[in-house]
């Protein structure tokens, strides 16, 4: 995506698919939890301006840029509905998260919640990975080992099978990729 060169196209596309379903005129009012996909840019801008004018938090456009981040991004509500500008803003937020979290999962969590260690952010990360066709499979057998077998060394002597290596197979999509390690100066309002 030429609009968002700091982020791998597959990663950015997965974020967009999760955030807006690829619809450029989506307005999500975080206060009322109501999301609307408008038929035109003008209608989306008018709705978002009204919501922001009431002091409510709203996510806008393809990458669902939050209204609280507009000042730091130097954007107006109207500008954020330009698809390329919206993608560039989303990429800046994601790259800034990557610079802080130093992992794609942490960056995605920060993109969604402002924190790299959030349970909600972790669930969001899995959804974005799923949009890109990446799924981490379950460990074969599907049961957790008892903690004493993992911690107490003497149990290995009495149960050599407990020491057998577990091979975890991760099957990523051939189209999935991470972020380019580009640092960005932008810090969303929720990270301060």
Model regions and ranges:
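Catalytic glycan-binding domains that act on GlcNAc-containing polysaccharides
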Residues: 1-138
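N-terminal secretory targeting signals
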Residues: 1-5, 133-192
């Amino acid at each position: 995506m030429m609009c968002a060169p700091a982020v791998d196209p597959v990663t950015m596309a997965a974020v967009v698919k999760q955030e807006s379903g690829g619809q450029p005129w989506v307005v999500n009012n975080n206060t009322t939890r109501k999301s609307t996909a408008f038929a035109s840019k003008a209608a989306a801008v008018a709705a978002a301006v009204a919501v922001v004018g009431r002091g409510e938090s709203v996510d806008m456009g393809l990458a669902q840029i939050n209204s609280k981040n507009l000042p730091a991004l130097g954007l107006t509500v109207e500008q954020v509905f330009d698809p390329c500008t919206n993608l560039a803003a989303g990429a800046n937020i994601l790259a800034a998260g990557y610079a802080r979290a130093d992992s794609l999962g942490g960056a995605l969590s920060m993109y969604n919640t402002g924190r790299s260690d959030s349970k909600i952010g972790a669930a969001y990360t899995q959804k974005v990975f799923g949009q890109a066709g990446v799924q981490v499979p379950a460990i074969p057998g599907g049961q957790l080992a008892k903690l004493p077998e993992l911690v107490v060394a003497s149990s290995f002597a009495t149960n050599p099978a407990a020491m057998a290596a577990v091979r975890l197979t991760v099957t990523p999509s051939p189209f999935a990729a991470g972020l380019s390690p580009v640092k960005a100066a932008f810090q969303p309002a929720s990270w301060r």
